[in-house]
Regions:
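Short, charged/polar N-terminal "headpieces" of proteins
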Residues: 1-24
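Acidic, aromatic-enriched beta-alpha/helix-loop junctions
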Residues: 21-58
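Acidic, low-complexity intrinsically disordered segments
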Residues: 45-85
């Protein structure tokens, strides 16, 4: 069993983190997610560093069957497949 969280900039995911008793793993999502975040920040007028950084948050931790590595890779694939932009 692994515990995982997703790092979001507003509603856009950017990274997954999973940990179990033996390991922890953090994976960034495809670069298109950061490109989207940067575009949205510019469109929303969040140009100061403080305004930009204030938009980041981790989701509440959740549990999922599997090792930290397996869960992190599965979440990354699911989030990337779900992106419809």
């Amino acid at each position: 069993m692994a515990t995982y969280s997703i790092l979001y900039w507003q509603e856009i995911p950017s990274q997954v983190k999973a940990e179990d008793a033996l390991d922890d793993m953090t994976l960034p999502l495809d670069p298109k997610f950061m490109e989207r975040i940067d575009r949205m920040a510019a469109q929303r007028g969040l140009q100061s560093t403080d305004d930009y950084l204030a938009q980041w948050r981790w989701s509440d931790p959740q549990e999922r069957e599997g090792s930290a590595e397996a869960v992190a890779h599965a979440l990354k694939a699911e989030l990337e497949a779900a992106a419809d932009w």
